[in-house]
Amino acid sequence: MCDTLGVLRGSYALFGKNSDLSSNEAEVTELYPARIYDGDEVACTYRLIPQAKETLSVLLSRPVWMWGAEIGVNEAGVAIGNEAVFTKGKYGA
């Protein structure tokens, strides 16, 4: 299980997350520059979605096998981190 931390104080924000990967599992860190697109679609895991016309630069980190990102932050300071959710409830209930 991963741990995520978020702290807000005044006009400052702190975000932290660990990945809980095996010591032998590779993690990739990638910097994507801001771009302007002309209406393409993006292939996500299970569907196509419209591509935003303009994107901000973003720094992302993920295990090599993952599509997308596990941890990241864009040039506007928006941070993301994914978490597994474990439940004893029935799927779809």
Model-derived segments and their meaning:
Residues 1-92:
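A contiguous strand-loop segment
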